[in-house]
């Protein structure tokens, strides 16, 4: 079963099929591509001190969800964004890379192409994630879920609305992926929460 568990020696074990791992890798690459747009300060001096030349909410709705305004008042929001957006993007990139890099190490080249002849998509990957990386995974999974939720316009009635869709509707599959990411977040958060009683692996 895919997900995370705490081994008896305290290590965090991640388990995914090749197919699930490839999907997560693809999602992180989409997040990285999105975060790479429009963040380079025009002034080299601003780049040195980490100040962005951007002071407005991104036009892309997903990017706006990932990098929201901190204040309702436009002037305050713009000023805060200039001083924080660059570092916020860098942190989110680091979270995405933490997921992508370990998947790249464990998937192997043959598993990166889901159409490769003879590939067993259900074959499981097992790898250890450090406590530090696990926290980065938690944040990265959240960014993926926010991105999908924004694209799908997920609201309070989402479960009923998407359940009513036919299996042929691509939005239903994307919503199932959205729900799966939420489940992964929940499991990992439980493992990282002190005094919790997560599923324990040998």
For each feature predicted by the language model, list its residue ranges.
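Charged, alpha-helix-forming regions
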Residues: 1-128, 132-202
């Amino acid at each position: 079963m895919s997900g995370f568990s705490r081994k008896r020696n305290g290590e965090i074990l991640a388990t995914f099929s090749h197919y699930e791992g490839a999907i997560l890798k693809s999602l992180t690459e989409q997040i990285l591509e999105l975060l790479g747009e429009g963040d380079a300060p025009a002034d080299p001096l601003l780049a040195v001190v980490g100040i962005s030349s951007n002071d407005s909410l991104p036009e892309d709705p997903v990017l706006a969800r990932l990098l929201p305004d901190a204040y309702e008042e436009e002037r305050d929001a713009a000023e805060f964004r200039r001083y924080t957006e660059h570092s916020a993007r860098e942190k989110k990139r680091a979270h995405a890379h933490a997921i992508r890099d370990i998947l790249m190490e464990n998937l192997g080249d043959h598993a990166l192409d889901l159409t490769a002849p003879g590939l067993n998509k259900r074959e499981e990957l097992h790898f250890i994630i450090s406590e530090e990386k696990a926290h980065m995974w938690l944040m990265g999974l959240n960014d993926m879920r926010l991105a999908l939720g924004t694209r799908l316009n997920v609201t309070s009635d989402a479960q009923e609305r998407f359940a009513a869709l036919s299996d042929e509707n691509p939005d239903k599959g994307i919503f199932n992926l959205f729900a799966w990411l939420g489940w992964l977040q929940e499991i990992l958060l439980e493992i990282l929460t002190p005094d919790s009683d997560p599923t324990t692996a040998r």
